């Protein structure tokens, strides 16, 4: 029977524009792109040139520091461009897709007969290993980092997040195959939500199922690691998105790299929020065509409103993206008296507005404004109310800002990822970019321990 872990700390932010459980069709794109920045902590080395012919599954770039970690093309076609930015940083590799797709055949495998080394080798050869992240440091892992355990969270509870159970329909076999494969490497802990009922999750085999009952960010894999088996110095755990587990399962079942995924197109500026089945690297413009309520004064987000990246119509669906969100930018708003005016349509954690009288089910159309500038940390205890982890979050942030590595280690930086602080950043009256601060601290520590 599954373990039930109840979490009281957190905050559910109910936004307008949640995707209905319906699919809309998206045409096959002429171009697809793989973006190295989607794989945090990895320095890319491009292994193709413009004009090269590739199949789906061929490597476009590798990890420069560990070249056996490849990153596979989502489609077959001709490499159209290797786009670089400042200091020749690789921004993306663009492939012009064939009309008839061709795949590298990696061979079907029976995962029950494989050992851990064989599983890792298969993922490396197919260019899928880079979809595995690790704690500490919250970066794309490498095969020399032997994990103590593998954590998979099937609970998506960030604002406007897509329903993984809906995405799972038709992919149950691949999910189980992927979980079984990962269990050959290390014990697997599967985190699900209290309201999730799919048997593919509740009765998953070869894993330990843990049910998390609580508000956002209960679905964050870092929160789940902290509440099940915290990471100590010198230990490594893998964290894997459940969609990536499906990718792994498809590889072992079919012998092909198939990066199809269901993406929620959501937000108050979307006329008809629904799901689209697309490939990793699909142009965002294809998903938003004819669905924007307004073409100007909107914020397009590659991901969810709290942890996603600001995007444009020229960007592409990310390697870990499960939703594309569009909300008002807020740059054309003229409010009389600003925050002083009593109102019922603005969200407030501290009940400064009367909107709390309408209950927790009221939906809000929040915009992208921060509504204030960065200021000193005066209010104590704000982070602790919404961060269900056994750490002193405020003191950890101060230690990172001060660059005190010893103090950072003592306060549990090995256990956290930037997205764990997303809700804390939302409620922070000091308007600090907590996720950016945590990322800087993790990078500093990783460099120090290299």
Each model region followed by its residue ranges:
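Buried, small/hydrophobic-residue-enriched core segments of structured protein domains
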Residues: 69, 83-286, 290-450
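Short, solvent-exposed loop/turn positions at domain surfaces
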Residues: 42, 48, 65-68, 272
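Short coil-to-beta-strand transition motifs
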Residues: 68-76
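N-terminal, Lys/Arg-enriched amphipathic/low-complexity engagement segments
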Residues: 1-47, 62, 212
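Short, well-structured beta-strand-loop connectors
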Residues: 48-62, 81
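Mobile cofactor-carrier "swinging-arm" domains
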Residues: 1-15, 22-23, 80, 85, ...
């Amino acid at each position: 029977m599954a373990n039930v872990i109840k979490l009281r700390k957190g905050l559910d932010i109910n936004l307008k524009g949640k995707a209905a459980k319906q699919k809309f069709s998206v045409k096959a794109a002429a171009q697809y792109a793989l973006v190295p920045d989607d794989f945090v902590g990895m320095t890319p080395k491009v292994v193709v040139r413009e004009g090269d012919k590739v199949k789906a599954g061929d490597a476009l770039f590798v990890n420069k520091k560990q070249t056996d970690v490849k990153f596979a093309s989502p489609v077959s076609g001709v490499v159209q461009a290797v786009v670089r930015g400042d200091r020749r940083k690789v921004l993306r590799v663009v492939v012009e897709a064939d009309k008839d797709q061709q795949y590298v055949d990696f061979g079907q495998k029976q995962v029950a007969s494989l050992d851990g080394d064989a599983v890792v080798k298969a993922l490396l050869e197919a260019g899928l290993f880079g979809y595995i992240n690790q704690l500490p440091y919250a970066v794309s892992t490498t095969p020399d980092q032997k994990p103590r355990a593998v954590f998979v969270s099937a609970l998506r509870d960030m604002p406007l997040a897509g329903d993984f159970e809906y995405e799972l329909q038709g992919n149950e076999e691949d999910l189980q195959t992927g979980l079984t494969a990962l269990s050959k490497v290390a014990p697997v802990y599967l985190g699900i939500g209290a309201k999730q009922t799919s048997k593919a999750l509740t009765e998953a085999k070869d894993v330990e199922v843990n049910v998390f009952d609580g508000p956002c960010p209960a679905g964050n894999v870092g929160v789940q690691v902290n509440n099940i088996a915290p990471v100590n110095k010198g230990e490594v755990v893998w964290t894997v998105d459940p969609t990536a587990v499906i990718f792994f399962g498809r590889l072992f079942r079919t012998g092909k790299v198939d990066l199809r995924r269901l993406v929620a197109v959501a937000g108050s500026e979307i006329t008809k929020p629904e799901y689209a089945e697309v490939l990793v690297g699909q142009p965002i413009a294809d998903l938003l065509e004819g669905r924007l309520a307004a073409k100007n004064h909107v914020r397009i987000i590659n991901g969810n409103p709290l942890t996603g990246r600001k995007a444009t119509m020229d960007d592409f669906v990310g390697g870990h993206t499960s939703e594309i969100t569009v909300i008002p930018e807020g740059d054309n708003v003229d409010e009389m008296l600003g925050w002083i005016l009593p109102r019922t349509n603005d969200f407030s954690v501290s009940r400064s507005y009367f909107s709390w009288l309408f209950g927790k089910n009221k939906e809000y159309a929040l915009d992208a404004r921060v509504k204030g500038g960065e200021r000193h940390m005066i209010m104590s205890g704000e982070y602790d109310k919404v961060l269900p982890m056994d750490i002193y979050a405020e003191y950890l942030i101060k230690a990172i800002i001060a660059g005190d590595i010893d103090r950072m280690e003592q306060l549990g930086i090995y256990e956290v990822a930037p997205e764990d602080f997303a809700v804390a950043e939302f409620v922070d009256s000091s308007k600090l970019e907590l996720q950016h601060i945590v990322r800087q601290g993790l990078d500093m520590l990783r460099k120090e321990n290299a």
